[in-house]
């Protein structure tokens, strides 16, 4: 299977936040333009994280997903604030291909079963924000609230439980590595990879092409990044060339 390369965009009230500076785009805050641009540049998928605090903001994001689905021809994952089956239904109807779940699934793990039963495992991406917690059995713990609070769960055990309940994919985000550009947390990836057999996406810490190759060697099926793309540190083509050169299949 080809390794997928996935840019991630944070969306608030229907606009992209965090610096994104594509030259030539009329408005670097428009998620649809950016997603289309990433699609043209070879992205295999695009992930949106909705960080809107308000109901109105979420409604705006839904409209954005609909526009995106009409103009962007790569699979679209939307996460952030998904609280149950109804939210998943709304996003899928709007045009999302997959939906990311995180905090709500920690509070109500049965939600994973409900979504899987209704829509199929393939639509659920469990997002795990993990960091090193030496007292956990695996050495890695689950966090919430942007990494500021411990969820009291072992990251590997939680990933296994979620897969048993029907999660079709795991997005593993290292809160320690996130934003450092020092590379993915390879030990964490290897620990989760050894425990689950669903597709695994690595996130958090990428800074150079070698980081993506290292994650692929650790067994991930996809690599996700934000700032390296937004700030033009790396292009999708450079990452795919690096992976190809290292012997991995890419699309």
From Swiss-Prot:
Its EC number is 4.3.2.10. Gene3D superfamilies: Aldolase class I. Signal peptide: none annotated. One of its GO terms (cellular component) is cytoplasm. The active site is at residues 10, 129. It is found in: Cytoplasm. It catalyses: 5-[(5-phospho-1-deoxy-D-ribulos-1-ylimino)methylamino]-1-(5-phospho-beta-D-ribosyl)imidazole-4-carboxamide + L-glutamine = D-erythro-1-(imidazol-4-yl)glycerol 3-phosphate + 5-amino-1-(5-phospho-beta-D-ribosyl)imidazole-4-carboxamide + L-glutamate + H(+). Its main location: cytoplasm. GO terms for biological process: L-histidine biosynthetic process. Disulfide bonds: none annotated. One of its GO terms (molecular function) is lyase activity. Pathway: Amino-acid biosynthesis; L-histidine biosynthesis; L-histidine from 5-phospho-alpha-D-ribose 1-diphosphate: step 5/9. Transmembrane segments: none annotated. Keywords: Amino-acid biosynthesis, Cytoplasm, Histidine biosynthesis, Lyase. HAMAP family: HisF. Heterodimer of HisH and HisF. Belongs to the HisA/HisF family. IGPS catalyzes the conversion of PRFAR and glutamine to IGP, AICAR and glutamate. The HisF subunit catalyzes the cyclization activity that produces IGP and AICAR from PRFAR using the ammonia provided by the HisH subunit. This is Imidazole glycerol phosphate synthase subunit HisF.
């Amino acid at each position: 299977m080809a390794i997928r390369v996935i840019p991630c965009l944070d969306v608030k009230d229907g606009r992209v936040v965090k610096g994104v500076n594509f030259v030539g785009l009329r408005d670097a805050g428009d998620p649809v333009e950016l997603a289309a641009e990433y699609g043209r540049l070879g992205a295999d998928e695009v992930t949106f994280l909705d960080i809107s605090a308000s109901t109105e903001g979420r409604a705006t994001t839904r409209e954005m997903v609909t526009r995106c689905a009409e103009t962007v021809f790569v699979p679209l994952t939307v996460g952030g604030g998904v609280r149950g089956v109804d939210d998943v239904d709304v996003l899928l109807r709007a045009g999302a291909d997959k939906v990311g779940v995180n905090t709500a699934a920690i509070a109500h793990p049965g939600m994973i079963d409900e979504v899987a039963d209704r829509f199929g495992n393939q639509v659920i991406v469990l997002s795990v924000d993990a960091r090193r917690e030496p007292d956990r059995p695996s050495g890695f713990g689950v966090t919430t609230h942007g990494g500021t609070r411990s969820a009291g769960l072992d990251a590997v055990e939680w990933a296994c439980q979620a897969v048993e309940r029907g999660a079709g994919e795991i997005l593993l985000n290292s809160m320690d590595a996130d934003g450092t550009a020092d590379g993915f947390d390879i030990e964490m990836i290897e620990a989760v990879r050894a425990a689950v057999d669903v597709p695994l996406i690595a996130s958090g810490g990428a800074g150079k092409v070698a980081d993506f190759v290292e994650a692929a060697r650790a067994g991930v099926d996809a690599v996700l990044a934000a700032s390296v793309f937004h700030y033009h540190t790396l292009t999708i083509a450079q990452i795919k060339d690096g992976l190809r050169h290292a012997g991995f299949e890419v699309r």
